[in-house]
From Swiss-Prot:
Alphabetical list of Pfam families matching this protein: HypA
Keywords assigned: Metal-binding, Nickel, Zinc
Function: Involved in the maturation of [NiFe] hydrogenases. Required for nickel insertion into the metal center of the hydrogenase.
One biological process term in Gene Ontology: protein modification process
Residues engaged in binding Zn(2+): C73, C76, C89, C92
UniProt keyword Metal-binding, yes or no: yes
Name the UniProt record assigns to this protein: Hydrogenase maturation factor HypA
Similarity section: Belongs to the HypA/HybF family.
Organism: Cereibacter sphaeroides (strain KD131 / KCTC 12085)
PROSITE patterns per record: HYPA (PS01249)
Amino-acid positions noted as binding Ni(2+) in the UniProt annotation, renumbered to this chain: H2
């Protein structure tokens, strides 16, 4: 379950930001997770609750914002949203695509007090 180690990284970022900006608690933490990031959201939610115990984010609500997969089509030169890495271009039907988005995971923002 790599979601546990992802949450440990999030905890480190939260603690660093709490020291830098002087907040005591995180009420809401919003994560953007790309379609191809390979993150199991249910496991991430469970790990988040466990790993955040004793930190500024203990008891925080985790909101996950889904980001679409995106690819550049070498046939038509356009960027398009794709559901699967192996889908053809939805604009021209071409099959020569390079994924350019959808594998990211980042903290979008936090509501703190």
């Amino acid at each position: 379950m790599h979601e546990m180690s992802l949450c440990e990284g999030i905890r480190g970022i939260v603690e660093d930001q709490a020291r830098r900006h002087g907040f005591a608690a995180v009420k809401v933490l919003r994560l953007e997770i790309g379609r191809f990031a390979g993150v199991e959201k249910a496991a991430l939610g469970f790990a988040f609750d466990v790993v955040m115990r004793g930190s500024a984010a203990e008891g925080a609500r985790l909101e996950i914002l889904d980001l679409p997969g995106r690819a550049l089509c070498y046939d038509c030169g356009e960027e398009a949203v794709i559901e699967d890495r192996f889908d053809p271009c939805p604009l021209c039907g071409g099959g020569r695509l390079m994924p350019v988005g959808g594998d990211e995971m980042r903290i979008k923002d936090m509501e703190v007090q």
